[in-house]
Structures are given as structure tokens and as C-alpha cells.
């Protein structure tokens, strides 16, 4: 049968990324307790396309994914990327995996246990060498220092999302990264709180007011102190409770030299 993708394209323009996006797929992730979490990810797969070809073979991406269906885990990403390059005749391959990850957390006073969900991502690219980025989105509470200073009865507070992405030399557990991030807001979030816990986290937030600027600077200071990390970016969005907009701040550090 005719292969339209291999036909020449007269415009002769190379494409940096082409492929399939937003595939829902089961994966396996090991947690810090050395147990396996089975979760469902959204997967994006791309390769570059040389200027002389009209199109890529979209079906091959899914075939590759299916072939590794029992092995889609962190230590298998480079193997998948190598196969993408080989099967699709490309110089570079890219794989993005976003998934929910659960951590067993205890309430701060009662000790009540519950699962807390965090949105995580693996982003991997392969040309000559592997480039891997770990990302986590962590919900926090932020309490406004200005409001606390001005108001007689309390201060406005809101939920915030801090997104941290890191490149590292040696393996970092998702749990350790989450724990670091949760120290950067006014208070962590919990899935389950009893009354004694609710009192504690409310007072903790009030005694630890943070602007969005404070939060990214705190994360920067903590991440910069980890020599294992070669690059990081931090973004924080505060979903303001007294405004019809969000507050936002971002920082980045690159030590790859």
C-alpha cells in the first residue's frame, strides 16, 4: 500500500516535535516505601521529523507504548526513547508522562492517616544523551502578611499550587521533594483533619504568613542547598480569596555549567 508519510515535502521544513498527545495509559511507580503504585497517566510522545519527509508514522508511537505496557516506569524511559528513535528514524525523541501520585500522610495533632494526591510528571528527551526532569505540583495554604498586619480579626488566606521541576545527578524520591515544598507555604494541606488538627493548621498558617514572593524564594533557598540538583524551576500560583485573579511568581536556577 502507498506510504504517504515517506513521500517528499516540497517545503523542506524540519519539524522539531511531532507525535501523539494525551494518551491515557497505566503505569507503575515505585514509592519511598519500596512498594509499587499502579496509576493512570496522560502520555505525550514526540520525535523530530526531517525536512524531506511529509509525515511521521503515528501508529508506531502507540505500538511502542503497548510493547512496554508492563514496564512503563522511571528506569525504562531511556529504552522506550531509544526505540522511538529507531522505529521512527529520528534524531531525537521526547516522552512526557503526567500522573497522580499518592502519599500516606498523618494529620499534625491527631495522627489520623489519609492518602494525599499530588500531580507528578516525568519529562524525558533523548538525542545523544538522556535528559530527564522530575516535576511535582503541591497544594499549599498561603496567608497574606499584609492582611494579617492590617486586620484586627484574622487575615485572608487561600489555597496555592507550587510547581517544582528538577534535574538531578542522583535519584530523588517524590516524597522528599513534596516534603521540601510543603515547608515553603504558610501551612501544608491534608486530606483528613479532625478538630484539633484544624485548629493547629489554622494557627500555623496565621503564625507563618507568606506572600507568593516569599514562597518561591523559600523554595529557591532550599533547592539551591541541595548539591545533587543541577537545575530547578519553581512556579507558585495563589488563588486569591479576596480578588478575582491569582498572584504568581517564578524562579529558576541552572548549575549545569
Curated annotation (Swiss-Prot):
InterPro entries: GTP_cyclohydrolase_FolE2 (IPR022838), GTP_cyclohydrolase_FolE2/MptA (IPR003801)
Site (May be catalytically important): 144
UniProt keyword list: Hydrolase
Keyword check for Hydrolase: yes
Pathway: Cofactor biosynthesis; 7,8-dihydroneopterin triphosphate biosynthesis; 7,8-dihydroneopterin triphosphate from GTP: step 1/1
EC identifiers of the protein: 3.5.4.16
Highest taxon in the source lineage: Bacteria
Reaction(s) the record says it catalyses: GTP + H2O = 7,8-dihydroneopterin 3'-triphosphate + formate + H(+)
A GO term, aspect molecular function: GTP cyclohydrolase I activity
One GO BP annotation of this record: tetrahydrofolate biosynthetic process
Family membership noted in the UniProt record: Belongs to the GTP cyclohydrolase IV family.
Function, as annotated: Converts GTP to 7,8-dihydroneopterin triphosphate.
Protein name listed in UniProt: GTP cyclohydrolase FolE2
Organism of derivation: Pelobacter propionicus (strain DSM 2379 / NBRC 103807 / OttBd1)
Amino acid at each position: 500500500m502507498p506510504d504517504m508519510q515517506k513521500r517528499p515535502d516540497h517545503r523542506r521544513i524540519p519539524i522539531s516535535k511531532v507525535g501523539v498527545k494525551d494518551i491515557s495509559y497505566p503505569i507503575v511507580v515505585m514509592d519511598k516505601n519500596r512498594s509499587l503504585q499502579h496509576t493512570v497517566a496522560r502520555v505525550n510522545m514526540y520525535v523530530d521529523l526531517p525536512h524531506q519527509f511529509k509525515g511521521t508514522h503515528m501508529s508506531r508511537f502507540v505500538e511502542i507504548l503497548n510493547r512496554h505496557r508492563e514496564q512503563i516506569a522511571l528506569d525504562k524511559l531511556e529504552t522506550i526513547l531509544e526505540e522511538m528513535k529507531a522505529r521512527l528514524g529520528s534524531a531525537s525523541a521526547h516522552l512526557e508522562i503526567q500522573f497522580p501520585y499518592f502519599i500516606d500522610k498523618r494529620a499534625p495533632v491527631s495522627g489520623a492517616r489519609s492518602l494525599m494526591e499530588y500531580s507528578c510528571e516525568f519529562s524525558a528527551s533523548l538525542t545523544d544523551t538522556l535528559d530527564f526532569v522530575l516535576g511535582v505540583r503541591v497544594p499549599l495554604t498561603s496567608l497574606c502578611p499584609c492582611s494579617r498586619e492590617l486586620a484586627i480579626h484574622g487575615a485572608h488566606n487561600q489555597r496555592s499550587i507550587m510547581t517544582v521541576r528538577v534535574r538531578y545527578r542522583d535519584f530523588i524520591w517524590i516524597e522528599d521533594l513534596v516534603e521540601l515544598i510543603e515547608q515553603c507555604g504558610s501551612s501544608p494541606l491534608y486530606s483528613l483533619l479532625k478538630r484539633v488538627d484544624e485548629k493547629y493548621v489554622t494557627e500555623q498558617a496565621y503564625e507563618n504568613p507568606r506572600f507568593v514572593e516569599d514562597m518561591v524564594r523559600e523554595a529557591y533557598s532550599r533547592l539551591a542547598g541541595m548539591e545533587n540538583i543541577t537545575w530547578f524551576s519553581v512556579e507558585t500560583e495563589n488563588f486569591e480569596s479576596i480578588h478575582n485573579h491569582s498572584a504568581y511568581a517564578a524562579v529558576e536556577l541552572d548549575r549545569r555549567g
